[in-house]
Amino acid sequence: MYRNMLLYPSPRLNNKQKQYLKDISILNQISYKLSLDSKSYFVITINILDQVINVEQFCFNSKGQLYSIFFKGKTAKLLCHTILNSNHINILLSNQHVAYLARELVKSELGILFNQQYIQD
């Protein structure tokens, strides 16, 4: 559903915004081919009213126990910087997972900016 919205963007957007959303849609189709890390995954949600992106990272420790780390921010750039430079994360993310995370954070920020529902791939 969300991908189709990006392929046919609102007529209220200018041409540059429409092209950007189409490009993001193509990147999302590529993301289905990614193999993500098995020791960690992210759940991203947005709060449009507060204009905040919420990220919860779920990690497995050496004993196989699941724990989570919560991040909150207003922009994709800030959250990427915070998550990737966080000292308490002892799990290295693959380059593919980092690229996927960055793409999803940008999509979530666009959801807030355009007042649209965000659905994580």
From Swiss-Prot:
InterPro entries recorded: PterinBD-DUF4346, UCP037673
Cellular component GO terms held in the UniProt record: chloroplast
Domain of life: Eukaryota
Keyword Plastid carried by entry: yes
Compartments where located: Plastid, Chloroplast
Keyword terms of this UniProt record: Chloroplast, Plastid
Chief place of localization: plastid
Family membership noted in the UniProt record: Belongs to the ycf91 family.
Name recorded for this polypeptide: Uncharacterized protein ycf91
Source organism phylogeny: Eukaryota, Rhodophyta, Bangiophyceae, Bangiales, Bangiaceae
